[in-house]
Amino acid sequence: MKQLLFCIFLLLLEGCSSNQPPAVSGQIDELPTIYPDYIDVTIPQSIAPLNFAVQTEGKACAVFTTEGYAFTVYASNGAFSIPDTDWEKLLTAAKGKQVEVSVLTEEKGKWNAFLPFHIRVSEDPIDPYIAYRLIDPGYQLWNEMGIYQRELSSFDPVSYTHLRA
């Protein structure tokens, strides 16, 4: 009986959660100020999610749309953390096309929408890794340095060499 009640509770939670964008009350006639600035860039199809932040005091919402696929991400502090699986599906559907990103912010219980921006998704493949040297900004007197490789589809770094003076 407890298992049945638990299953019903989970179904109710699933039914109450929504991936739909909120109803828009007002329009802001400018592009959102986001960091990092991904407005009108071209990206490879296999890149990791491009998380970003928008300046807001309250809740924020980003709607990612392309032909055949769309999803919504909410942020309580303005920092969007895009789920890997949704991002991969989006880029697969948008290969050779563009993704429209609509950012909404909540003020006094009303949702306002900025002008949407676009991210183009290239059909061309890229190398899966990038190698780089990481040193402190004052490199003339370095005391620590490393050679790293980063996978571009997940941004996971691997250290090859870590040197100390």
Question: Where on the chain are the PLM-derived regions?
Answer:
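Conserved small/polar residues in nucleotide/adenosyl-binding loops
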Residues: 161-165
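Short, aromatic- and glycine-rich surface loops/edge beta-strands on solvent-exposed regions
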Residues: 95-107
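C-terminal motif of bacterial Sec signal peptides marking the signal peptidase cleavage site
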Residues: 14-15
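Low-complexity, Pro/Ser/Thr- and charge-rich linker/hinge segments at domain boundaries
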Residues: 34, 113-139
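Structural motif
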Residues: 140-149
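Contiguous beta-strand segments within globular domains
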Residues: 37-56
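Surface-exposed loop/turn elements that mediate protein-protein interactions on large endomembrane-trafficking
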Residues: 149-160
